[in-house]
């Protein structure tokens, strides 16, 4: 069964699958969708990550903790987790959203991750939901340092590779679509130690490169 595969990827087995099904349902696909779950999951995620950072960095000030949390809970990071779980294969979208490639859109992917966090909370309680967030984020949290939250993904990737005496990444524009005022850039990022080619998407070349670098970092720092 498809949902069995997804639950293995998530590392959590639902007692009530209805919660998971609702978390996977976008508002374009019906009335019983994941919007309310996303609202709740956002709060649980912020608390879980805030708690982990508070305990991990006893000397960090409020500003540093806030910046690190913002880095970890932002849309791009959640979308990377969603792709790792392959959520695009399991989400239920309306016909229009499906046709426009909604299953690839970062906002939809990130909302789905937050909805799943809420679904776990409803299924098993707060302690389990927090533990699950910590499990998903354990490698990202291990790499996090107070000053790093202010650095962009390209800088962090460069420093990660330099610190291990590895060659720097190469970026290349794959294509540019749209009119001058509304363009979408696709950029590849390659590093020597990984065979995989990472594709970043953004409204500018810089944003696309940052997106690709973020994906590489996630690959390097998650199991």
From Swiss-Prot:
EC number assigned by the record: 3.1.26.3
One GO term of the biological process aspect: regulation of gene expression
GO function term, MF aspect, one: rRNA binding
Catalytic residues identified in the record: 42, 114
Catalytic activity: Endonucleolytic cleavage to 5'-phosphomonoester
InterPro entries for the chain: dsRBD_dom (IPR014720), RNase_III (IPR011907), RNase_III_dom (IPR000999), RNase_III_sf (IPR036389)
CDD domains: DSRM_RNAse_III_family, RIBOc
Segments forming domain RNase III: 3-125
SUPFAM superfamilies in UniProt: dsRNA-binding domain-like, RNase III domain-like
Residues holding Mg(2+): 38, 111, 114
Function, in words: Digests double-stranded RNA. Involved in the processing of primary rRNA transcript to yield the immediate precursors to the large and small rRNAs (23S and 16S). Processes some mRNAs, and tRNAs when they are encoded in the rRNA operon. Processes pre-crRNA and tracrRNA of type II CRISPR loci if present in the organism.
The protein, known as: Ribonuclease 3
């Amino acid at each position: 069964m498809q949902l069995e595969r997804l639950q293995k990827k998530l590392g959590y087995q639902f007692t009530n699958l209805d919660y998971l099904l609702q978390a996977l349902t976008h508002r374009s696909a019906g009335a019983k969708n994941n919007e309310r779950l996303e609202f709740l999951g956002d709060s649980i995620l912020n608390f879980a990550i805030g708690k982990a950072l508070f305990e991990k960095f006893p000397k960090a000030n409020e500003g540093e903790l806030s910046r690190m949390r913002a880095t970890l809970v932002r849309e791009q990071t959640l979308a990377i987790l969603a792709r790792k779980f392959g959520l695009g294969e399991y989400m239920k979208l309306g016909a229009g959203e499906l046709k426009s490639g909604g299953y690839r859109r970062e906002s939809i992917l990130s909302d789905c991750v937050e909805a799943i966090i809420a679904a776990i909370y409803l299924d098993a309680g707060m302690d389990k939901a927090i533990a699950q967030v910590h499990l998903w984020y354990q490698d990202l949290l291990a790499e996090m340092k107070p000053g790093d939250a202010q650095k962009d993904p390209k800088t962090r990737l460069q420093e990660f590779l330099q610190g291990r005496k590895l060659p720097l990444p190469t970026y290349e524009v794959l294509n540019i679509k749209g009119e001058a005022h509304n363009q979408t850039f696709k950029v590849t990022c390659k590093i020597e130690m990984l065979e995989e080619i990472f594709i970043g998407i953004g409204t500018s070349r810089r944003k696309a490169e940052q997106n690709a670098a973020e994906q590489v970092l996630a690959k390097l720092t998650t199991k």
